């Protein structure tokens, strides 16, 4: 165990968990983006959510087997990578099926991404700080709430400047979180 690595994990965890809690810009403008940019109708948008959630539910056991096989650390990295790929597909996908695949990857990513909570718990136990779990989660939730609030405010202005600008922000945040995921190690 490297104490310096654990300290770095402790500092970065709230930022990683807070900024990767969702596709930040996507959450603020998803319906607007799908109707204005992708020209989807309401039934396509509703079916997009339904298909992705049903697929994710059906994949839960295979996904859990993959997590068990690759471990917590690689699961977090895979989740971050899938969020990045998802944001790219949702942004650049021109066909409905490509956007469906992007949305499925978005849902699946969170199954892997949620292993960050196990990593946090394990690392805090290693440091005899398990009673601070709520503090770390609260800090991450606060960062997520502030980021979401700010992004919700600016996303509409960005969308009015260029319809793709908020999604470029989304991809950028996903890339940063993917890079940060390499510091999210289950020691």
Where are these regions (language model features)?
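Symmetry-related core transmembrane helices of the 12-TM Major Facilitator Superfamily/SLC fold
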Residues: 165-183
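Cytoplasmic helix-loop-helix junction between adjacent transmembrane helices
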Residues: 102-144
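Transmembrane alpha-helix termini and helix-breaking/packing motifs in multi-pass membrane transporters
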Residues: 36, 68, 147-170
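Paired small-residue
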Residues: 15, 97-106
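Helix-loop boundary and gating motifs at the non-cytosolic
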Residues: 2-58
